[in-house]
C-alpha cells in the first residue's frame, strides 16, 4: 500500500445527499475536510492544493466542480447517510468507513483488523496502529488515528496526542520574537511572517502582496466585484463572511461587547478594542515614514497614502481617483443622488453623515461654539471661524483680477461676477437677473411676501437672515464693525465701508451725465434729479 494521499480521506456527496445536509452539517463537513488537508500538509504529505480545498476555502459548494477535479483522483462517494436524518455522528461514521474502504482496496495483505485492546495506551502486545474503532491497523507504512471529538486524519504519526492538544487548550509552540503561543507549529510558522514582513502571496492584477493566501483570496474580490455572502434579512451582499456577520447585528440590535471601564456597549469586538484605547491613551500603530502614532491600524494605513500619494480607488463614472475607499463611496452619491442619512426629526435626507450631524443642531438649538472675543455663540465651528474675522480683520480670499480681498469665499465668488458682468440667476416672476443664487432666493420673497426670519425680541420678521442679524443689533446695541482709522464703530458692514470713504476720499459712484463722483449710491440718485428735472 502506498503513502496516504488526500483522495484517501476525501468524502464526496451526490447532489441529493448534499441538499439533505443542513447548514451546521455542511459546516462540519467543510471544517473536517480543511482540517484533514492541513494535517496532511503539516506532515509533509500533500504537495499541491487539491481543487476541493480551494473550493471549500472560498465558501463554494463542492458540487459546483466536477468530481475528478476536486481530489485529483477518483474518490469513493459516501452513501452511508440516511436520507431523512443526517446527524454529526453519521458523518463521522461514514468518514471512518470510507477511509477503511480505501485501505481495503489496496489489498487485504497489507490491512488486517483485529479485536482486542480498548485504547492505544493499553496495547502492550501488538504495538501497532490503533484506528479508534476497537481495531488494529497493521501496515508497514501508515497508521491512522481517529480523534474522539472530530474526524481528523494523522499520517505517519507515532501517536495522536499532538492532535489532541487542540482540545486540551495547551499551546506548546511559542514565538521567540514576541512570546505568543500556539497549539500548532503551522500556525506559529504563519504567525512569524508578521515579524519577518514576508508577503509571499502576490495579486497578479495589482501587484499587492499578502502574508496569507486567504487574504489574497479575499483581496481578489475587489477586482472581480464578487459579493458571495448575502444577508437573508435584507438581501445586501458582502465580499467577506466577517462583514456579513457584523452586518447581521444591525437587524438584531444586539450589543454584546461591553466596556468594563465605562459600561458602553458595542456590536463588534473590534469596536470595543478600539474604544478601550480612549481610556488607556495608547497609540500602538506608528508610521515608519514620519513617526506619527495612531490608535487604529486602519488610520495608519490611511495615513501612509499621504506619503505615497497613491490614489487606488477610481470612480468608474467620471474617472476621479481617491486615496480611501470610503471617500469613493461618498463621491459616488454625486452620480446616484443617494441620500442615505435621514433626519428622524424632520425627515430631511443627506448624502453625508457629517451633514446630518450638523443639521441636527438646528432642532436642538445647541450653540456649542463660542467667540472668546465677544461671547457670541454659533451652531457650527465653521461659522465661529468666519465670525472671528470681524475681530481680526482677516480677509483670506483675494480676487486675482483686481486684488480686492474678502472675509468669505462666497463674497469673493459674488465679487468675481463684477468682472464678467454675468447674472446667471433670473427671477421667473419679473425677469430680474442676479449675480448670486442666494440673492435670487431672497428676492423671490418680495413676490411671495414670505418673511421666515423672525426676531424673538420684538416679533418683527424679515425676508433674509442678514436683515434679521442687523436688526437684532438695535436690541443689543452691538457695533461689531470698527473703523481702524478713527475707531468709530457701526452696526452694519456696508455703513463702515461707506464711512471709510471719508478717510480715503474715494467716490466710486459716478454720474454718467456729467462725470461727477459720489461716496454713496443714494447721493448719486439724488444728484441725477438735476439732469432729469424729476421731483422726488
From Swiss-Prot:
GO terms for molecular function: DNA-binding transcription factor activity, RNA polymerase II-specific; RNA polymerase II cis-regulatory region sequence-specific DNA binding; zinc ion binding. GO terms for cellular component: nucleus. The keyword DNA repair does not apply. The gene is ZNF737. This is Zinc finger protein 737. Keywords: DNA-binding, Metal-binding, Nucleus, Repeat, Transcription, Transcription regulation, Zinc, Zinc-finger. May be involved in transcriptional regulation. Gene3D superfamilies: 6.10.140.140, Classic Zinc Finger. Residues 4-75 form the KRAB domain. The keyword Transcription applies. One of its GO terms (biological process) is regulation of DNA-templated transcription. Belongs to the krueppel C2H2-type zinc-finger protein family. A zinc finger (C2H2-type) spans 173-195, 201-223, 229-251, 257-279, 285-307, 313-335, 341-363, 369-391, 397-419, 425-447, 453-475, 481-503, 509-531. It comes from Homo sapiens (Human). InterPro entries: C2H2-ZF_domain, KRAB, KRAB_dom_sf, Znf_C2H2_sf, Znf_C2H2_type. It is found in: Nucleus.
Amino acid at each position: 500500500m502506498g503513502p496516504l494521499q488526500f483522495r484517501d480521506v476525501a468524502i464526496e456527496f451526490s447532489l441529493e445527499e448534499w441538499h439533505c445536509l443542513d447548514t451546521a452539517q455542511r459546516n462540519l463537513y467543510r471544517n473536517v475536510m480543511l482540517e484533514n488537508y492541513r494535517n496532511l500538509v503539516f506532515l509533509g504529505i500533500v504537495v499541491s492544493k487539491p481543487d476541493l480545498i480551494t473550493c471549500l476555502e472560498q465558501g463554494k459548494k463542492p458540487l459546483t466542480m466536477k468530481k475528478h477535479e476536486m481530489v485529483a483522483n477518483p474518490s469513493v462517494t459516501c452513501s452511508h447517510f440516511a436520507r431523512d436524518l443526517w446527524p454529526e455522528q453519521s458523518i463521522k461514521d461514514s468518514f471512518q468507513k470510507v477511509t477503511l474502504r480505501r485501505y481495503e482496496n489496496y489489498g487485504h495483505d497489507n490491512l488486517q483488523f483485529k479485536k482486542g485492546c480498548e485504547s492505544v495506551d493499553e496495547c502492550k502486545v501488538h504495538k501497532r496502529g490503533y484506528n479508534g474503532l476497537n481495531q488494529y491497523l497493521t501496515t508497514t507504512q501508515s497508521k491512522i488515528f481517529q480523534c474522539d471529538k472530530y474526524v481528523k486524519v494523522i499520517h505517519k504519526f507515532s501517536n495522536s496526542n499532538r492532535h489532541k492538544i487542540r482540545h486540551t487548550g495547551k499551546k506548546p509552540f511559542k514565538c521567540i520574537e514576541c512570546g505568543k503561543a500556539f497549539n500548532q507549529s503551522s500556525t506559529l510558522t504563519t504567525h512569524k511572517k508578521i515579524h519577518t514582513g514576508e508577503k509571499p502571496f502576490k495579486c497578479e492584477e495589482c501587484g499587492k502582496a499578502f502574508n496569507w493566501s486567504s487574504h489574497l483570496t479575499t483581496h481578489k474580490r475587489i477586482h472581480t466585484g464578487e459579493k458571495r455572502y448575502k444577508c437573508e434579512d435584507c438581501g445586501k451582499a458582502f465580499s467577506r463572511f466577517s462583514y456579513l456577520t457584523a452586518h447581521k447585528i444591525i437587524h438584531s440590535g444586539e450589543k454584546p461587547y461591553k466596556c468594563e471601564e465605562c459600561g458602553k456597549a458595542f456590536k463588534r469586538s473590534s469596536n470595543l478594542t478600539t474604544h478601550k484605547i480612549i481610556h488607556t491613551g495608547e497609540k500602538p500603530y506608528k508610521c515608519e515614514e514620519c513617526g506619527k502614532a495612531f490608535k487604529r491600524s486602519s488610520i495608519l494605513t490611511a495615513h501612509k497614502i499621504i506619503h505615497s500619494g497613491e490614489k487606488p480607488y477610481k470612480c468608474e463614472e467620471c474617472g476621479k481617483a481617491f486615496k480611501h475607499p470610503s471617500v469613493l463611496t461618498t463621491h459616488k452619491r454625486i452620480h446616484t443622488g443617494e441620500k442615505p442619512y435621514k433626519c428622524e426629526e424632520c425627515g430631511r435626507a443627506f448624502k453625508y453623515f457629517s451633514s446630518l450631524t450638523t443639521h441636527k443642531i438646528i432642532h436642538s438649538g445647541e450653540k456649542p461654539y463660542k467667540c472668546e472675543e465677544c461671547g457670541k455663540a454659533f451652531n457650527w465651528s465653521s461659522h465661529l471661524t468666519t465670525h472671528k474675522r470681524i475681530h481680526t480683520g482677516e480677509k483670506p480670499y483675494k480676487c486675482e483680477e483686481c486684488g480686492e480681498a474678502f472675509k468669505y469665499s462666497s463674497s469673493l465668488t459674488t465679487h468675481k461676477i463684477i468682472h464678467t458682468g454675468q447674472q446667471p440667476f433670473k427671477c421667473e416672476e419679473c425677469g430680474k437677473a442676479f449675480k448670486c443664487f442666494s440673492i435670487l432666493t431672497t428676492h423671490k420673497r418680495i413676490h411671495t411676501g414670505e418673511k421666515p426670519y423672525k426676531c424673538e425680541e420684538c416679533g418683527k420678521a424679515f425676508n433674509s437672515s442678514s436683515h434679521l442679524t442687523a436688526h437684532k443689533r438695535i436690541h443689543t446695541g452691538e457695533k461689531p464693525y470698527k473703523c481702524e482709522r478713527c475707531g468709530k464703530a457701526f452696526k452694519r458692514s456696508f455703513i463702515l465701508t461707506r464711512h471709510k470713504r471719508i478717510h480715503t476720499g474715494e467716490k466710486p459712484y459716478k454720474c454718467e451725465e456729467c462725470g461727477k463722483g459720489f461716496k454713496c449710491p443714494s447721493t448719486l440718485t439724488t444728484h441725477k434729479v438735476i439732469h432729469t428735472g424729476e421731483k422726488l
